Amino acid sequence: LMVAMTHVRQMEKADRDRSQALLAEAELKSMIEDYPDSPLLDEAKLKLREVQEVLAEGVYKIAGFYYLKKVFPAAADRYREALTKYPDYSGSSDALFYLAESLRRNNNGPESAIYYARIISDHPLSERVNDAKQRLTAMNAPIPQPNPVALARAQQTPHEDKGIFGKMF
């Protein structure tokens, strides 16, 4: 844990060099795997979650850059990366929305419908739900029901303001 914490302290912001965050992530994963009975396990898991949030935010910001530049295939790839590598990312509903938007704007409507639907089913209290429903309606695609487990989890989790970057789009 001490080696991992050294990397955590040297981490940059999400939009800067990721090397220390990647090293911290590797050290924390190794510690969690190698020492499952450690009294520091809970602290290591919490730190890993924090490090992965920084890494996910970095990937999300890169995707946002591509989206703003209208390079939709690259944006879609980065949004997918954020969602795949960091499934617990706090901005996953926004990443899903902009992944769907990138696909739609790159003339891939059928695939975009999958991600709009995931916003509604997996993030039922997200600010993106109404936009996702509108997009699905415009495509004549079915609108799914919220997943009851996701709904219960969303109701228990306090809603955080994502700051200025989350409001840019």
Q: PLM features: what roles do these ranges have?
A:
Residues 1-169:
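Acidic, polar-rich low-complexity tracts and alpha-helical solenoid repeat scaffolds
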